[in-house]
UniProtKB/Swiss-Prot annotation:
It is found in: Secreted, Extracellular space, Extracellular matrix. It comes from the Eukaryota. PANTHER family: COLLAGEN ALPHA-1(XXIII) CHAIN-LIKE ISOFORM X2, SI:CH211-266K2.1. Residues 1-982 are annotated as: Disordered. Pfam families: COLFI, Collagen. Residues 122-170, 200-209, 216-237, 251-261, 333-352, 358-385, 435-448, 460-472, 507-517, 633-646, 666-691, 702-729, 757-775, 798-820, 854-866, 877-892, 916-935 have a biased composition (Low complexity). One of its GO terms (cellular component) is extracellular region. Residues 1071-1100 form the Fibrillar collagen NC1 domain. One of its GO terms (molecular function) is extracellular matrix structural constituent. SMART domains: COLFI. Its main location: secreted. This is Collagen alpha-2(I) chain. Keywords: Collagen, Extracellular matrix, Secreted.
């Protein structure tokens, strides 16, 4: 029936489905005429116009400012040699030329007259080393070289025997949570145990399942009301009963207090666009708006048509650039050679040179025949080191050894003092040309040269294959708010309106970029020579030229003043060997030399059977020194040492003879590009090319060699988008562009990060009341928590898929000059020069490579005297693995290993002893009145009551569930019932006093807790400060936020012990147990047992 009460408003309904897209509206009315546009971008350079007629030669112009160096012209044909002119004044030094080709050998000139003594010239470059002198006497032993670089790790030796079991380490920190293991299979049923002794009577069993309803009995007589019994001891709380069915719907509750604002929801997915609305009526024309900001630069205009040929020039052009320098004239006739000057007086002896580097290693001897392997000896203790013996006399110089490998770089030596300048020796005869030495090692890295000029633009490389997509980077932090975004995609194209009135003519655009260079016109007549321009900047230093031919000797200058002391001279060549001296007296016995390097490993003998380990013998006597082993192979070349410090400037050497003038060098590199010429006349517009397919973006190629400057290439394909640059400053606002055609709708973007929490919303309408829930347990009141701070921004969603490449954009304005390109690859070798004169003898070449064939074995030499101890040899090759050593001491305890895989299910543990009875729990809240229980046993028959009217037989009700026991307070005394005889019912009377029993049990439990504390708040297992009585103090680790309850080391729980460790907390604030790690240590013995019973607790 209708009760007249208004139903609560459920609020607005859900959003409907999105409608289909409507048809396009009719075209709008034409807009008002726009303002005159800003001048457009400069147009593309027009095509080259036809060649104009040749103008008359102009008068000579004023001398212009110094122009940039022009490109060198092509070399002209070689002219006939002119007569030798008079000697001119010395000109200003010219720019250094490129390295010329080697000239032909000139004829010997006439001998010149001896000149006066010239000034002493600067010291010349170091001359080539002369031929090797005779071997000098053996120098003093140099200091031991630095330790070599660490050798490569040897092969792993065989595994050693297992060490003794180490002592148990301290427990490690809890590890991270392992993955949840799979449920193990059910274990097999264990064997039956032996019959235990009879246990104490157990507590009452749980209520059995409800039996089927009995047949309805006859209605019994109403019994008299019994006397109130004594309140029973509160039973232990029962297990939670099964979940009851839903109760009837309760009355509507009163509106609750307004809750705190919830956390902000995640940002919803962007809804689909609604249907397009119908077009509105045309509004009246508004007043003209203010002048808009300057629009973005429009696209470059199309190429203009070819303009008409220009008029013939009215006045002659300005003076042309000076021509390139003429070719060098032919070489003059060489002069006659001057006489040698007189030898100077002998200078004082120079300082003693540094000790020479160690000589190369001697030849490796032939390997001896392998000896048979002896039985393995016992390892003796090392004997004490003997004293060093005195060095014996030096032996005769051995033959020159084969070249060793490049040694490790030595430490940087101190700068030597400057030596006194030596006298100039007589010029020796020119030696034969030495054979070319092998390639030298790479020199140390030179200082960074000056930055090269900008390279010419290389030709466009082919598109490379597309690169792989990179892995997603880590989520970046929230960026600052960006500047206003770029202009959005153009909207749908409107229907064209009628053409507006013609606008005013725009300002002329800026001059277009210069067109390609026109064909070369006919050569004009030469202008009058201009005045000399100012001296140009000195050019960059050219590469050093090759050595020229030896010119005739100059006139000797006057003797110069003494130069500063020169750098310390190189070690002189050894003198001739002197005659053998008289034999010296025998010296006293020298100290033993240091141990020689290890000898070569002998061939492996037959493997003997392994004998049993014998006892360690006493230390043996030190054996006699073995013969010096062969020098091991040199180690691998070391890394290049650091460049040494600059030495002091040497004295200026004498000026060397002038070289012959070389032939003119190849054309120099192209000079910097000149300034743009005037724009050429526009050429005819070419046909529009077909649109090419977009190529895939290529991988970055290696930088190519600098190509010649090509003609301007066509507009390149759009490259892949570059990395986002920093936000630019806001440009001036452009005029509004025409609406473009509608772009395809993009894919739906990923859900953005949740925004910051919004403002507090208005209270919502009260919802309909839900059905009344089941009554929960009475929880303890929680403390009111602080309001949480808004969560941080979520991680940035993955980037959307890359859209298709757009059409090729208009050609952009020319960019700024790029950074100088990388140094190009080395050019091809020049033409081979003509053979030069025989040069002076070269320095001794680097050691040659090892020959293929071994030479014949020489005759055995006399045994030499014992040499001095040589420097320590290079590290020998890795020897074979040594004999197995004795077991080492136990290593330190390793770090905690990774959690192992889940083990198999263990055997069923022994049954634990019965636990102690718990303390009586606090009184629970009053339970709901239970439904009527089953009929109890018939009570004693009461006196007959008055007869009531007979009722109808009812059906027996179903069995109700037992209610939880409430704390029953005694009611007021009822009226006295009728008396009856209780004899014969003594067996039904309680034989115990329950209150006394409960007190005794409580005391017993407290005594047990004193003896075996279980770790609760009232019975803590161990207090770190027992004198503090205001709380429960445990050992905590605040770094890992752990609560550590350490066991007392003396009371480890055994399987037969009674160990029940529980830990009660004051407040139950969670429903799950976040155990991060559980690592029982020292388990697995036959008498050890481990169990864990976790209740609903929460700690961190």
């Amino acid at each position: 029936q209708y009760d007249g009460v208004k139903a609560p408003d459920p609020g607005p309904g859900p959003m409907g489905m999105m409608g289909a897209r409507g048809p396009p509206g009719p075209p709008g009315p034409p807009g008002a005429q726009g303002h005159t546009g800003h001048p457009g971008e400069p147009g593309e350079p027009g095509q080259t116009g036809p060649l104009g007629p040749r103008g008359p030669p102009g008068p000579p112009g004023k001398s212009g400012e110094d122009g940039n160096n022009g490109r060198p012209g092509k070399p002209g044909d070689r002219g006939a040699p002119g007569p030798q002119g008079a000697r001119g004044f010395p000109g200003t030094p010219g720019l250094p030329g490129m390295k010329g080709h080697r000239g032909y050998t000139g004829l010997d000139g006439r001998k010149g007259e001896p000149g006066g003594a010239g000034a002493k010239g600067e010291p010349g470059a170091h001359g080539a080393a002369g031929s090797p002198g005779l071997a000098g006497s053996r120098g003093r032993a140099g200091p031991a070289g630095p330790a070599g670089a660490r050798g490569a790790d040897g092969n792993a030796g065989p595994a050693g025997p297992a060490g003794p079991l180490g002592a148990a380490g301290p427990p490690g920190f809890p590890g991270g949570p392992g993955p949840k293991g799979e449920l193990g299979p059910a274990g097999a049923t264990g064997p039956s145990g032996a019959q235990g002794s009879r246990g104490e009577p157990g507590p009452n069993g749980a209520v059995g399942p409800v039996g089927p309803p009995g047949n309805p009995g006859n209605n019994g007589l109403n019994g008299a009301k019994g006397a109130a019994g004594t309140p029973g001891v509160a039973g232990a709380p029962g297990f939670p009963g099964p979940r009851g069915g839903p109760g009837p719907q309760g009355p509507q509750g009163a509106a609750g207090q307004r809750g705190l604002a919830g956390d902000p929801g995640t940002q919803g997915v962007k809804g689909d666009g609604g249907p397009k609305g119908e077009p509105g009526n045309s509004g009246p024309q508004g007043p003209p708006g203010p002048q808009g900001e300057e629009g973005k630069r429009g696209p470059t205009g199309e190429l203009g048509a070819t303009g008409p040929a220009g008029n013939r020039g009215a006045r002659p052009g300005s003076r042309g650039m000076p021509g390139s320098e003429g070719r060098t004239g032919p070489l003059g006739m060489p002069g006659a050679r001057g006489a040698s000057g007189a030898a100077g007086p002998r200078g004082p002896p120079g300082d003693a040179g540094r000790a020479g580097e160690s000589g190369p290693a001697g030849l490796r001897g032939l390997p001896g025949s392998p000896g048979s392997s002896g039985p393995p000896g016992k390892e003796g203790a090392a004997g004490p080191a003997g004293q060093d013996g005195r060095g014996g006399p030096p032996g005769p110089t051995g033959p020159r050894g084969q070249p060793g490998n490049l040694g490790f770089p030595g430490p940087k030596g101190p700068s030597g003092e400057a030596g006194k300048p030596g006298d100039k020796g007589a010029t020796g005869p020119t030696g034969l040309r030495g054979a070319p030495g092998p390639d030298g090692n790479n020199g140390a890295t030179g200082a960074t040269g000056p930055a090269g000029g900008p390279g010419e633009k290389g030709e466009q490389g082919a598109s490379g294959a597309p690169g792989f997509q990179g892995l997603p980077g880590p989520a970046g932090g929230a960026g600052e708010a960006g500047k206003p975004g770029d202009r959005g995609l153009p909207g749908d194209q409107g229907v064209s309106g009628p053409a507006g009135a013609k606008g005013e003519r725009g300002n002329p655009g800026a001059a277009g970029a210069s067109g390609p260079q026109g064909p070369l016109g006919p050569r004009g007549p030469a202008g009058a020579p201009g005045t000399d321009g100012g001296k140009g900047e000195p050019g960059a230093a050219g590469a050093a030229g090759g050595p020229g031919h030896q010119g005739p000797g100059g006139m000797p200058g006057e003797r110069g003043a003494a130069g500063p002391p020169g750098g310390k001279g190189e070690k002189g060549e050894g003198g001739h060997r002197g005659p053998d001296g008289n034999a010296g007296r025998d010296g006293s016995r020298g100290m033993p030399g240091p141990a020689g390097p290890p000898g070569p490993t002998g061939a492996n003998g037959d493997k003997g059977e392994s004998g049993a380990f014998g006892p360690a013998g006493p230390a043996g006597v030190r054996g006699a020194s073995g013969e010096r082993g062969e020098v091991g192979p040199a180690g691998a070349p070391g890394f290049a040492g650091p460049p040494g410090a600059d030495g002091q400037t040497g004295a200026r050497g004498e000026r060397g003879p002038s070289g012959g003038k070389g032939e003119s060098g190849p054309s120099g590199p192209a000079g910097p590009a000149g300034q743009s010429g005037p724009p050429g006349a526009s050429g005819p517009a070419g046909p529009t090319g077909a649109r090419g397919d977009n190529g895939p973006p290529g991988l970055t190629g290696f930088p190519g060699a600098a190509g010649r400057v090509g003609a301007a290439g066509p507009a390149g394909l759009v490259g892949p988008p570059g990395a986002a640059g920093p936000a630019g400053k806001d440009g001036p606002r452009g005029l509004r562009g025409d609406p473009g055609p509608s772009g395809p709708s993009g894919d739906q973007g990923m859900v953005g990060p949740p925004g910051p929490s919004g403002e507090k919303g208005x209270p919502g309408t009260p919802g309909t009341s839900g059905p009344l829930g089941l009554q929960g347990f009475v929880g303890l009141p929680g403390a009111r928590g602080d309001r949480g701070s808004p969560g941080g921004a979520g991680a940035v969603g993955e980037a959307g898929r890359v859209g298709p490449a757009g059409p090729a954009g208009a050609r952009g304005a020319p960019g700024n000059l790029g950074l100088p390109g990388m140094t190009g690859p080395q050019g091809e070798a020049g033409r081979e020069g003509n053979p030069g004169n025989d040069g002076p003898p070269g320095r001794p070449g680097a050691p040659g490579f090892k020959g293929d064939r071994a030479g014949p074995t020489g005759a055995a030499g006399r045994p030499g005297n014992r040499g001095e101890s040589g420097p320590g040899g290079a590290a020998g090759a890795v020897g074979p693995a040594g004999a197995r050593g004795a077991a080492g001491p136990s290593g330190p305890r390793g770090e905690k290993g990774v959690a192992g895989e889940k083990g198999e299910r263990g055997m069923k543990g022994l049954r634990g002893h019965a636990g102690l009875q718990g303390m009586p729990g606090p009184s629970g809240p009053s339970g709901d009145t239970g439904s009527a229980g089953p009929n109890g046993p018939a009570g004693p028959r009461g006196p007959a009551g008055p007869h009531g009217p007979p009722g109808k037989d009812g059906r027996a009700g179903g069995h109700g569930t037992l209610g939880s026991p409430g704390a029953r307070l005694p009611g007021p005394p009822g009226p006295a019932g009728g008396g009856y005889d209780v004899s014969g019912y003594d067996e039904y009377r309680a034989a115990k006093d329950y209150e006394v029993d409960a007190t005794i049990k409580s005391l017993n439990t407290q005594l047990e807790n004193l003896l075996t504390p279980e770790g609760s708040r009232k019975n803590p297992a161990r207090l770190s400060h027992p004198e503090w009585s205001s709380g429960f103090y445990v050992f905590c680790d605040f770094n890992t936020r752990e609560t550590c309850l350490h066991a007392h080391p003396g009371s480890l729980a055994r399987a037969e012990g009674n160990s029940r460790f529980t830990f009660s907390v004051l407040e139950d604030g969670c429903t799950r147990l976040p155990l991060l790690d559980l690592a029982p240590l020292d388990l697995g013995g036959a008498d050890q047992e481990f169990g864990l019973d976790l209740g609903p607790v929460c700690f961190k």
